[in-house]
């Protein structure tokens, strides 16, 4: 929402006088000098603390991690945006036809105390150029643009930073972006327009940026590309201020339309519009100074019949724009501080977590290096123990190793049940054939024990290969879990990690072979048909009772009460014995095979791996080799430490800020 004239008068930060006097133009008159002094005192009292806070964060380098409040100036090519920056900063910037701003120019203005000398610095890539006079700025920026974007009309997204320190500038950060163009000319890339739009969007989409959209007064504002781009990233106009330039070029009779735009009656922006008249090309050719341009602008608006009202509303001239921008920037800083504080807190936490992954710096002393390796191996072994005991810490939506193994063992139990059920039909036919063709002198109802044994043995034998498959699956799950522990503890030490993985693989093969032998031995023992008498009797009794209950449920009476059928009775008897034994075999095999696997693939695997890791400590000569880091690890650790330090310092400064 744009403040009315009355509202403006009620704001503490209002009535700041005109922009600072440009350097090198101090002899313009006592009135201007008084205005500058008045601005300085009010600025120091009410504005400086906010700017100082952001400047201090920027000086810390926080801008490497998070966006800080700033002002970006965008506009169509030759819309007058550089002139606006020039008028605000008092520094003459590059001018000309075509694309003048070919790299983002970050203009950092720092106010010095009265009497201190003007200082400037242009920085790009790793080059710093110290400036001692404002007249050197234009050439230094052009040199930087040629260095970064090449001689010609190409653009680059690399920053050029211009630091200006002077008693006659406010503390502001302004960003001049390349002018929007639609058609490539000369040796420009064919997609120059798309490149520029992408570059501009990268800046204006940041919530921390106030967008100054510069539009000539003599064009239809609804069709301007700059305003359209700003509305895409800031649809409510919360961060956008429209600035109309070149009011002296408006066609006679269209002045009222310009007034309507400035009064926010055409394309609505919450922050509204302002209008300024900066130096034109003719003014520059006539060597009109920046201070004289401000006086000429004041006269223009005072004497213009339509635009005079805008001056009275505080919506015209560069001094009013400077006052407005100061208020907007301070308001924006205060609005951004809570979010900035949260972002710094979150970034500090994530950086701390990332730094923990890289661990501490490797000691230089050999004895300390050995102790460091002992700590790393002990941490690894503790993590392995936690896995074996089912106490490892897992992230959300992940599960512990034992949970994964339990699922496999449950599937194994289901496989046994499925296998026994699948063989029932074939068993019935086999038992029937024996009963009808091969029964010897046994009386009806007596089970041929040899047939009983053969049937049981065959069924159990079919489970051997599924047991091997489960063994291989579980081994792979355990191997993956142990490898993850190695990556967690040793990922930055490629020799130690590689040695651990090699040791892990050797032990895995050894333990898998041992487990396979034990499982096959178990199935060989299962070929001996045996069960404790009392256990078997109970199982047989249970089967008979269940069958009797089922029969009674189906027919209303048990089969024993029906007319006996010797053949059916004999078949039932055999199946009762088979089912009784299979139940006990199921209980035994479903538990014993997982026990074998846990013993060899989890318990012994872990113990041998832990012992193998401790054996690495016996060779003290290999300590340095094992602790050799990846080439970028120490650099990354240093980078994270620096980031952590500046974020911690930023947190302290934000905590002390009185606002």
UniProtKB/Swiss-Prot annotation:
Region (G3 motif) location: 176-179
GO biological process terms on file: defense response to virus; receptor internalization; synaptic vesicle budding from presynaptic endocytic zone membrane
Polar residues bias spans: 559-568
Annotated region described as G1 motif, given as residue ranges: 75-82
GO terms under cellular component: cytoplasm; microtubule; nucleus; plasma membrane; presynapse; synapse
Record's signal peptide: none
One Pfam family linked to the record: Dynamin_M
Residue ranges constituting the GED domain according to the UniProt record: 571-659
Annotated region described as G4 motif, given as residue ranges: 245-248
Chain intervals for the UniProt region annotation (G5 motif): 277-280
Sequence segments annotated as region (G2 motif): 100-102
GO molecular function: GTP binding; GTPase activity; microtubule binding
Domain Dynamin-type G as annotated: residue spans: 65-338
Top-rank taxon, per record: Eukaryota
Positions in coiled-coil regions: none
UniProt region (Disordered), positions on chain: 547-568
Induction notes from the record: By interferons.
Residues bound to GTP: 75-82, 176-180, 245-248
UniProtKB keywords: Cytoplasm, GTP-binding, Nucleotide-binding
Subcellular location, principal: cytoplasm
InterPro entries, A to Z: Dynamin, Dynamin_GTPase, Dynamin_GTPase_CS, Dynamin_N, Dynamin_stalk, G_DYNAMIN_dom, GED, GED_dom
Role according to the record: Does not show activity against influenza virus or VSV; although it only differs from Mx2 by 8 positions.
Entry's family note: Belongs to the TRAFAC class dynamin-like GTPase superfamily. Dynamin/Fzo/YdjA family.
Name of protein: Interferon-induced GTP-binding protein Mx3
Organism of this sequence: Rattus norvegicus
């Amino acid at each position: 929402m744009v403040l009315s004239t009355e509202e403006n008068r009620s704001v503490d930060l209002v009535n700041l006088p005109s922009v600072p006097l440009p350097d090198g133009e101090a002899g313009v008159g006592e009135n201007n000098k008084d205005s500058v002094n008045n601005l300085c005192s009010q600025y120091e009292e009410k504005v400086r603390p906010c700017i100082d806070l952001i400047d201090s964060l920027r000086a810390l380098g926080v801008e490497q991690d998070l966006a800080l409040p700033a002002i970006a100036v965008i506009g169509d090519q030759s819309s007058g945006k550089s002139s606006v920056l020039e008028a605000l900063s008092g520094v003459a910037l590059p001018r000309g036809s075509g694309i003048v701003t070919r790299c983002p120019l970050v203009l950092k203005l720092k106010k010095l105390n009265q009497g201190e000398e003007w200082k400037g610095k242009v920085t790009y890539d790793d080059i710093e150029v110290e400036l001692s006079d404002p007249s050197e700025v234009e050439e230094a920026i052009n040199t930087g643009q040629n260095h970064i974007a090449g001689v010609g009309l190409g653009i680059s997204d690399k920053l050029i930073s211009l630091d200006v320190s002077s008693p006659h500038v406010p503390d502001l950060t302004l960003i001049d972006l390349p002018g929007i163009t639609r058609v490539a000319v000369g040796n420009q890339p064919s997609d120059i327009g798309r490149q520029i739009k992408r570059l501009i969007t990268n800046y204006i989409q940041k919530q921390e940026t106030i967008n100054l959209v510069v539009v000539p007064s003599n064009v239809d504002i609804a069709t301007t590309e700059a305003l359209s781009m700003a509305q895409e990233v800031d649809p409510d106009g919360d961060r956008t201020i429209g600035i109309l330039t070149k009011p002296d070029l408006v066609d006679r009779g269209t002045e009222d339309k310009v007034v309507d735009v400035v009064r926010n009656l055409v394309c609505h922006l919450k922050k509204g519009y302002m209008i300024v008249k900066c130096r034109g090309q003719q003014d520059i050719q006539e060597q009109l100074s920046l201070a004289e341009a401000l006086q000429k602008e004041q006269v223009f608006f005072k004497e213009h019949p339509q635009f005079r009202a805008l001056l009275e509303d505080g919506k015209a001239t560069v001094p009013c724009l400077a006052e407005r921008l100061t208020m907007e920037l301070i308001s924006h800083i205060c609005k951004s501080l809570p979010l900035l504080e949260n972002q710094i807190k979150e970034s500090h936490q994530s950086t701390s977590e990332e730094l923990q992954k890289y661990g501490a710096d490797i000691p230089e002393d050999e004895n300390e290096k050995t102790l460091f390796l002992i700590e790393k191996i002990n941490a690894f072994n503790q993590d392995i123990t936690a896995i074996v005991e089912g106490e490892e810490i897992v992230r959300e939506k992940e599960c512990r190793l034992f949970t994964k193994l339990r699922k496999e063992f449950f599937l194994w139990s289901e496989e046994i049940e499925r296998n026994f059920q699948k063989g029932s039909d074939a068993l019935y036919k086999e038992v029937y054939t024996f009963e009808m063709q091969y029964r010897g002198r046994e009386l009806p109802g007596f089970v041929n024990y040899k047939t009983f044994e053969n049937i049981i043995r065959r069924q159990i034998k079919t489970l051997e290969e599924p047991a091997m498959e489960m063994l291989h699956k579980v081994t792979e799950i355990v191997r993956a879990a142990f490898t993850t522990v190695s990556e967690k503890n040793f990922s930055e030490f490629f020799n130690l990690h590689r040695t651990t993985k090699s040791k892990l693989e050797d032990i895995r093969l050894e333990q898998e072979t041992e487990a396979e032998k034990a499982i096959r031995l178990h199935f060989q023992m299962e070929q001996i048909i045996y069960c404790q008498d009392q256990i078997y009797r109970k199982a047989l009794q249970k089967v008979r009772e269940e069958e009797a209950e089922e029969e009674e449920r189906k027919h209303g009476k048990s089969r024993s009460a029906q007319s006996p059928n010797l053949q059916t009775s004999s078949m039932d008897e055999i199946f009762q014995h088979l089912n009784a034994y299979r139940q006990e075999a199921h209980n035994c095999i479903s538990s014993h095979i997982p026990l074998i696997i846990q013993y060899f693939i989890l318990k012994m695997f872990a113990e041998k791996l832990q012992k193998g890791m401790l054996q690495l400590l016996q060779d003290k000569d290999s300590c340095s080799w094992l602790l050799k880091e990846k080439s970028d690890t120490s650099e990354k650790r240093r980078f994270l430490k620096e980031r952590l330090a500046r974020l911690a310092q930023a947190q302290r400064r934000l905590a002390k800020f009185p606002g």
